[in-house]
Every structure is written in structure tokens, then in C-alpha cells.
């Protein structure tokens, strides 16, 4: 089961990146499970098991945050390792369990990567469609909020295309659509309603299975420069990503994000203390499954304490309602083994469908599924299961949030200051690149967009911390406005037109005369 849960990761990534990411998830799952099984086979002292569970949860939280792996984050890894800690084991059984985990992980890898044989550019299509919709919202309702959302969506689409591997005709068309979405948010003579409807129409066609629609060319040859400059820029950036020096720099950045002074460390410390406190409280009260409290506490921690408080309420409500659902379906699940399997499959599907849309509704489905899994070994008294689950949920939520409140994250303000400096530097580079070759200009614009996205994320994280020194909110606002003005000015600067890169065999699109070789 542990290996199969790896299939929950990487759904928004292009298949080339997804294959590598899922391989890493399988290895991380196996490593965490191995540490838990070895610990469980060597000792039965609850205090040691809880300490190891809390330490594993903190390491998994820090690793997932540093790599930005996305949902479901560390929660699934913590669920598996914590449950394994409290399962009776013998040391000789561990290799077989790990081999089964790797085998199931390989199946999960095939399931998640296999659709590439049918729809190779599916993730890229969805990312580009989201960028087009965000651009349409920006055109229809100009304002700081929609501008930030459009910038973030366009940046995410570019990153998805950069990670997709070698260019194909479809990806070339998708790149043109993203460049078109980026250019569409600048002022134009087109009626906003008509332009927004056109962008939404392009988004709907992009999500489909048919050919990717190419935006209509501008009326003049010279106006081609804005959009097609981006194609040369992404070619140059894709080539830079293959540079071994760039990869080494990325690894060093990852290590720095886990080193002293990192804003991720306070959240990892919260996870360590909260999970340990929750486990020890449940053990002291004689609850039979302290790992439930550990998982509950681990699932609460978000980027700041405000989001953690919201997640605490959602998790508690969802788990308590989920216990009621479990009590209702338990008699049905015990009629036949097939009924138990079907119930687990149903709640697993419901959890996958709901949890990204509404967390507490997803928790309503996850809770009965987790309780029903225990029935595969042997039936348990319903009252005991329900009582333990309710107590673990309440204690885990209380202990987890208490740790979040006690461990402050004053480094969040420092992250904002660093983001302000990076944004100012990126804006200066973008302004200087206005007279440079198109590839450099496009790359500088994307770097500025990335810095603006990082600045907004850092500011939102810092403002959600309850105990924090005064934040430079006016400086953040001024930096965002200046960055948006620079993006608009550079997007409006057309370049000379000449031979374009090929998008499909025998055809070309107009593009600037200087490209990335």
C-alpha cells in the first residue's frame, strides 16, 4: 500500500519531470518506511517510537517544502512511516516489506507516467489553459489582484513548458499561447470583453484533445517581436537548464534552503514539537494508536500560523464528520470482503476528487478510508475505533496548533526583505535588457516575473504570522507596481521580424532576427 500511495504525487508536472519526481517520491517513501520498520523491530518503547515518528515527520516536512513538491506534501509520507512504527515487526521481515514497497512504487510510477503514451502534452495543455484564463480575468477586470494572479499563472505555465523536455510542434504552439497570454494583459485597443472571451475560448480549445489553436497573428509584421521573442528566450533557457553548472547551482540552492537561517526551519521545528507532543499525550492517556495523533498534528502545518489555524479547523471538522460516516458504512463493509474493498476504493476516489477542492470535505472521505484499512487485518470493536479516532483527532489538533503558536517564525520578514532586493535587481536587469538580443530580453522578463511571484508569496507568508516585526508593506506594494510597469513596458517593445523557428515540419512563424543558438 505504501508504494501505491506514491501515485498521489506529481499530477501537475509534465511527464518528463513527473517521471523523475515520482522516482524520488518512491525512494523517499521506501527510506521513511525502512527507518520506521527497523525502529519498530528493535524496540517497543512507546516513547522511542513517538520520538522517531516526530523526527521523521519533521524531516519529511522540511524536504517536501524545500523541493516544493506540491500536494499532498509530507502528509502521506508521515502517515505511512508513523503507522509502520506501531506495527509489530521482526527485523528479518523488513527487506520483504521494502521490496514490496518498491514494486508497488514501480506500478504507481507506470500508472502516473503511462498516460504520456496517449496524451504527451496533457499537463502542459492544462497549465497553458490556466494561464489563458488568468489573462482573461486580468483583461476583464484590471487590478492588482488579477494582475498578480495572471503573472503567477503565466510564470507557472512557462516553468511547466521549460520542464517538459525537448520541444515538439504542440509544445511550440503552447509556447506561443503563453506568450500571447502574457502580451494580452498589456493595454490594447481591443474591447476588454471581446478579448477576454477570445482568451477563454483559446483556453477551452487548449484543454481539449484536438490540435492546439495558434493565436491570430498581429496586423503588422513588426508587432511579431513581442510574442515570438519569448520563443527564442525559452529555447535559450531550456538549453541553460541542461548545463551541468546550472544543475549544481540548483542543488546548492536546495541545500541552502535546508541550512541555518532558512525560513523553512521554524515550520520543521513546529512539526517536530507538535507531533512529539501529540504522540506523548495520547500515549499518556492510554490511546492504542498514537500515530493517528502524530499524523493529525503533522497535517496541520502550513506556510504560516494563520493558514495553520484554518487547516486545524478544517482537519478537526472533517475527521469528526468522517468518523460518523465510518460508523454508518461499517456494517456494510463487514458483509463480505468484496464490500470492504469496494468501500475503500470509493472513499479513496472521493478523497482524491475532493481534497484539492475543499480540504475538510476531503478529510471526510480520508477518515473512513483510513479506519476501513484496519479491517483488512481483523475486525476491531467499532466503539474502540471511533473513540480512539475522536480522541486522537482532538489531541493531535490541540498539540499541533499549540506548537505552531509557541514556535515563532521571525525569519519570514527576512525572506520578504531578500525578495524585495531580488525584485529590484531583476527589474533593473529587465530594463537594461530592453536593448539586448531578444533571447536575453525574454529571459530577463521571466526572471522579473519569477521574482514578483516570490515576493508576493513571501509577503503573504509573513503577514500570516501572528508574532512578527513590522513588515515593509508599502515597499512591497511599490515594488510590485514598479515590476508590473516594467513588464508592461518591455512587453510592448516590438522587435524586428525575420525568419522564425520551425513549429512544424515545413512551416515557420515570424520571429526576431537574433535568436538563441
Positions of predicted regions on the chain:
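Pore- and pathway-forming membrane helices of multi-pass small-molecule/ion transporters and channels
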Residues: 1-15, 25-33, 50-93, 97-109, ...
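Hydrophobic alpha-helical segments that drive targeting, anchoring, or assembly
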Residues: 7-27, 31-38, 43-44, 48, ...
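Membrane-interfacial segments
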Residues: 39, 43, 67, 115-123, ...
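Cytosolic regulatory and coupling regions of membrane transport/channel systems
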Residues: 93-100, 109-288, 407-517
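Membrane-spanning helices that line or support transport/gating and their immediate boundary helices
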Residues: 109, 113-117, 312, 316, ...
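Conserved mid-sequence domains
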Residues: 242-347
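Hydrophobic alpha-helix feature that most strongly marks membrane-spanning transmembrane helices
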Residues: 305, 321, 325, 329, ...
